[in-house]
Amino acid sequence: MCGIVGYIGYDNAKELLLKGLEKLEYRGYDSAGIAVVNDDNTTVFKEKGRIAELRKVADSSDFDGPVGIGHTRWATHGVPNHENSHPHQSSNGRFTLVHNGVIENYEELKGEYLQGVSFISETDTEVIVQLVEYFSNQGLSTEEAFTKVVSLLHGSYALGLLDAEDKDTIYVAKNKSPLLLGVGEGFNVIASDALAMLQVTSEYKEIHDHEIVIVKKDEVIIKDADGNVVERDSYIAEIDASDAEKGVYAHYMLKEIHEQPAVMRRIIQEYQDAEGNLKIDQDIINDVKEADRIYVIAAGTSYHAGLVGKEFLEKWAGVPTEVHVASEFVYNMPLLSEKPLFVYISQSGETADSRAVLVETNKLGHKSLTITNVAGSTLSREADHTLLLHAGPEIAVASTKAYTAQIAVLSILSQIVAKEHGREADIDLLRELAKVTTAIEAIVDDAPIMEQIATDFLETTRNAFFIGRTIDYNVSLEGALKLKEISYIQAEGFAGGELKHGTIALIEEGTPVVGLATQEKVNLSIRGNVKEVVARGAHPCIISMEGLEKEGDTYVIPHVHELLTPLVSVVALQLISYYAALHRDLDVDKPRNLAKSVTVE
């Protein structure tokens, strides 16, 4: 959600900033802009819409310089337009700012300090940059003014500030919003994500909340909230830039769907010891063993993965498990058990709602485990333990390979804990995950069939329903989410038995209903639910599993262990959703109004 880049060094900044913003497109945005400093002049280029439009405007000018900042905006305060786009400038044009996050007290600050100031935009960001000018006019240095303003802000922010009279510095601060320092020889950068600046460096330093950072081309000074200089080691971002390219695929989403077999193999390799046994850190095992209840905290697709993980944790490991939507949990925490363990699932490791819960549970002294795709992310740093997904960069807004990776890692965790508890395993998990990998490959190879299903069932519809029972119900929720995210079809997932309690009233002639039938004990029941909607005119699409199929089923997935079917059936739903959006000529990778990493609450 939004993205920031910045460069200070020896090279011209404009092209580096534009390329950096292009690498952040996956985060979701509705406008973009850059600001470049040369001598004592700052020039701002910004446009509503895609970065391609911004590039046209920026390339039409010869102005360039060795210092600059850039921003992709996902609207929170004010509609998407040119005036509300970042960067924002102070009234005298001296200060230029980019900001990710939400300032909760901006109206109060505006009323207290900025009476009579004329504002161009509706944003909270413009209040920040006008405050810097205000305190500068009171005689404070730029660093002092910036520090003073940051101390007044309530909410989340990642900030990058330029001063036209001090072209050798970018002033930086953050709180509850991701921002990194990139380190180079004779230059330094800032970025919301290491991917943005891999073009120039792979060496990064973390910025912690409430720190003030002075970035120059040949040094970086980090100060804590008390003004003390902080020494911090750098690390190498272990990301292959080629992993973030589409390669031969038309879209990132299609590429990432096709990568799932490789991701499964990587997970099997990473969580297996030399003797071929499952392995994770013993400290994690101990904390899970000691927990009397697990609370899974997540949002969106990660929440759906958590619902599947609950099945593993309870059925295999024997640990009572609850799955909660992060944005609700933080305001409505239930009565907790005596020895809870909190498991945070987040592809990016930056989900603001989940982080808000983690902050509260850390205050209570509860143990925590993050399952994420990004080492060094906020949730990873602030939790007691981390399990990595090893899925590689996921660029498409609609999550695919992270979902299956999350489920696979949860299955491994559950089996290891089951063994520690002395519970009999009814599954050779590594062997079964290998079967899952082969099954996913078979479905990916059947992409033309999925395209035909999408055409037959979803090309013209405005509504669709996904139904399942037991673990299939959890997958139906994810299938519906994928379809609505990228095709804009109103899609909902329901437990099969709940249709008759209200939803069946929405069924009319031709309404597509996707029924998942991969569970033997409810196979007849879910098929009965399909018959109920067919009797009312629905257009049924049944996805079943080998051994449970019936004549007339639309697609049959290869046979795998019944609790691992979500890893396989969801791939069919991902492809169907992809082709439904493709045939509607929609932007599959960057659907409207959505952001990849939701970094505001």
Curated annotation (Swiss-Prot):
> How would you classify this enzyme at the top EC level?
transferase
Known catalysed reaction(s)?
A: D-fructose 6-phosphate + L-glutamine = D-glucosamine 6-phosphate + L-glutamate
CDD domains reported in the protein's UniProt record:
GFAT (cd00714), SIS_GlmS_GlmD_1 (cd05008), SIS_GlmS_GlmD_2 (cd05009)
Any one Gene Ontology MF annotation carried by this entry is: carbohydrate derivative binding
Q: Where is the SIS domain?
A: 284-423, 453-591
Q: Which InterPro entries match?
A: GATase_2_dom (IPR017932), GFAT (IPR005855), GFAT_N (IPR047084), GlmS/AgaS_SIS (IPR035466), GlmS/FrlB_SIS (IPR035490), Ntn_hydrolases_N (IPR029055), SIS_dom (IPR001347), SIS_dom_sf (IPR046348)
Q: What sequence ranges are listed for the domain Glutamine amidotransferase type-2?
A: 2-218
**EC number in record:** 2.6.1.16
Q: List keywords of the entry alphabetically.
A: Aminotransferase, Cytoplasm, Glutamine amidotransferase, Repeat, Transferase
For this record, the Gene Ontology CC terms, alphabetical, are: cytosol
What is the annotated localization of this protein? Cytoplasm
Q: Please provide an example of a Pfam family that matches this protein in its UniProt record.
A: GATase_6
Keyword Membrane in the entry? The reply is no
- Summarize the subunit comment: Homodimer.
In terms of NCBIfam families, this protein maps to:
glmS, PRK00331.1
Alphabetized HAMAP family for the sequence: GlmS
This molecule's function is given as: Catalyzes the first step in hexosamine metabolism, converting fructose-6P into glucosamine-6P using glutamine as a nitrogen source.
- Protein name, as recorded: Glutamine--fructose-6-phosphate aminotransferase [isomerizing]
